[in-house]
A protein has these predicted regions:
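Helix-loop-beta segment of a Rossmann-like dinucleotide-binding subdomain
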Residues: 116-148
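Glycine-rich FAD pyrophosphate-binding loop
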Residues: 10-34
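N-terminal Rossmann-fold NAD(P) dinucleotide-binding loop
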Residues: 4-8
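Beta1/beta-strand and adjacent pyrophosphate-binding region of the FAD-binding site
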Residues: 1-3, 22
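A conserved short coil-to-beta-strand element within the FAD-binding core of flavoproteins
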Residues: 160-167
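Dinucleotide-binding Rossmann-like beta1-alpha1 core, especially the glycine-rich loop
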Residues: 30-33, 37-122
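Conserved aromatic-histidine-acidic binding/catalytic patches
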Residues: 3, 30, 34, 134-142
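Amphipathic alpha-helical segments that form well-ordered structural scaffolds
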Residues: 10, 41-48, 145-153
Length: 167
């Protein structure tokens, strides 16, 4: 169970020397789903655990993603892409959207979406690690492989596993 092993790995990593941690898990309860669409906070979670990105990607067969595409969003055939990025750059005097709206009122025709790096890159199928780490991204992973990866780390940090069910 991914949620259980995420919790165990985090607790074992941060509190392992002061607690005894046991995870109860049943092999009889199958894994629900295989592919997992993640969001950017997973990068922070992995950093908390000291997991390097290359090791994580290899272990989970991860691919990069810059947002989530929703098909048939409001109507059949309509799509919506929720980018992980921010739009434009705020100024000390006002948020970017105020400048963009002012531009629209004065004949500017660019969509607000044109000012989101992650959205533009996703729509063009491009990705790069930028030196300033300003690209917001996440991963699509094999959740079963991630659970196994975290289990290995949690057990190495002292977590014990018991086969069973709690009713």
């Amino acid at each position: 169970d991914l949620a259980g092993w995420m919790t165990a790995a985090a607790m074992a990593n941060t509190l392992g020397s002061v607690i005894d941690l046991t995870l109860v898990e049943s092999e009889a309860i199958g894994t629900i789903g295989v592919g997992e669409s993640t969001i950017p906070p997973l990068l922070l979670f992995n950093r908390l655990l000291g997991i390097g990105e290359a090791d994580f990607m290899r272990a989970t067969k991860a691919t990069f993603k810059l947002g989530i595409k929703f098909e048939n969003w409001r109507d059949v055939g309509e799509t919506y892409f929720h980018s992980f990025g921010s739009v434009g750059k705020d100024h000390w005097s006002a948020g970017f959207q105020h400048f963009w709206l002012h531009g629209l009122q004065n004949g500017h025709t660019h969509s607000l979406d044109d000012y989101c790096l992650e959205l533009k890159a996703a729509l063009e199928g491009k990705f790069a690690h930028l030196p300033d780490e300003r690209m917001n991204y996440s991963y699509h992973i094999d959740s079963g492989r991630y659970a196994a990866f975290l289990r290995q780390r949690a057990e190495a940090d002292g977590t014990k596993r018991i086969e069973g069910r709690i009713d």
